[in-house]
Amino acid sequence: MLRTGWAGNMYVVSSVAHPASVRAAHPARVGSWLARWWPLVAVTALAAALRLSTLNLQSFWFDEAFTPLHVLHPSLWATLRTVSHTENTPPLWYVLAWADSRVLGTGEIALRLPSALAGIATVPVAWAIGHEFAGRRAALVCASLVAVNPLFVWFSQEARAYALFVLTAALAMLCLLRAEREPTRGRMAAFALTGSLALLTHYFAAFLIIPMVLWLACEPRVRRAALPAIGALVLVGAALLPLISAQQGGNGTQWIGKWPLWERLQAIPQYYLTGYSGGELGHRIELLVALPILAGLGLGLRRMLERPHPKARRGVLMAVAIAAGGILIPIVLVPLGADYLAPRNLVAAMVPVTAVIAVVVVWPGTGRTGIALAAAIALAFTAISIDVDLTPRLQRSNWRGLAKALRGGPRERVITTPELGSAPLRYYLPELGSHNLQAGSSVLVSEIDETGVRESAAELYEPFRASAGEPPAPGFHLLARMEVGALAVYRFVSPVPRMVSEATLRRHVITLAGPRSKVLVEAGSQESP
């Protein structure tokens, strides 16, 4: 539509968009946006469904229950002080958990929600990483695998720092890629910030940051611009050293060295293929999941040799370097006396692993075969993630269900449990006292409940004693034996309250945990030294 008229001594002819054409352009822009981004929206929605729909399906385990019982306090300062004495993790996640608990409380959904949101947010970050490497196809595959991988889903439903660790490390990797491509001051600052957040979330972030820093330092084109960012990361790492030293006084990592190294090394690929609890599925399922990955990598590597793609190849090398640092450095440190190699601590290194798989499997020239193999990997991951929700033996031990079975007992009662059952039982049974029965003391009780784990990960629980089910003290008889998933409880009762010593209770605890077992006392029980 034309508009004409005089402006001063000039006659002006101008073009004005017709309102109808403006209205027509708006749907076109929306349609263009949807066509471009609907795959990412769909994959992110799938990630949200897998994480949020069953957020409180599983019981808290020891570490999750320990946080609201002993770490979180009304005061943030008191919480941080407790972190320095009882935890083996930097403080960032606990600051978020403290803020979350002030608003939403300390229930399962409330404390797990930050992890779920972090897991969901990692999906678009994975998309961006894949896009930086090799375009939209690699972006879609990378985001899809992160969305449905059972290991990432598991830690997105755990009230611990791991999901936030994955997110911050993935953000640091993305910022590294963009800073390396265009080394502006702002992009280097973003890399320094996200890398610092990763270090403040989990100490194992250092093993991922080291190869990132070395990559920038060895690249003449960006070295000078990267120096301030590298310096900032070094300062943050140095600032954490006093906290690391203070936390070494605890015993939170002693269990790692008791887990045979070979079993831990085997668990690293198993965790990625079938999830944290996927060992229960057996090696056949691991092989079935690994087959499309290996086939896709083989096909993609062949096409890489036939059709070189310098940018994508450089991205693959960078991702391999980051993943290698995150996995191999902790392994190398084991024979040097620094054995902190728990497979769960390597979870963030699985993001660059996923990026490598995504880029190589759909490398240019792999065609429909590459797409089919990528879809097969995603479907296998999805099936296992759903299977965890449907199969109790793949879930965390059901201390919530066991506590429900124990409710309504007499006030004169003690409960014996493996060490890893003490915090969950106290969380779900608030009537239990806040302390264990001390060595050399006795307690007047009419019921003794002995709990244990029938079957679970060997590195976490001990087997039952052969004498399990026999009365632990004179005058008591077996009232009932109950099973809740992999957990079992023997309930022994006496017609009248009897004084029972701590030594007697510990001798007859149904697991072979010895000193690591706990004797929990009901708040109404009478103790004597």
PLM region spans:
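Short, intrinsically disordered terminal tails adjacent to the first/last structured region
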Residues: 1-33, 377-378, 526-529
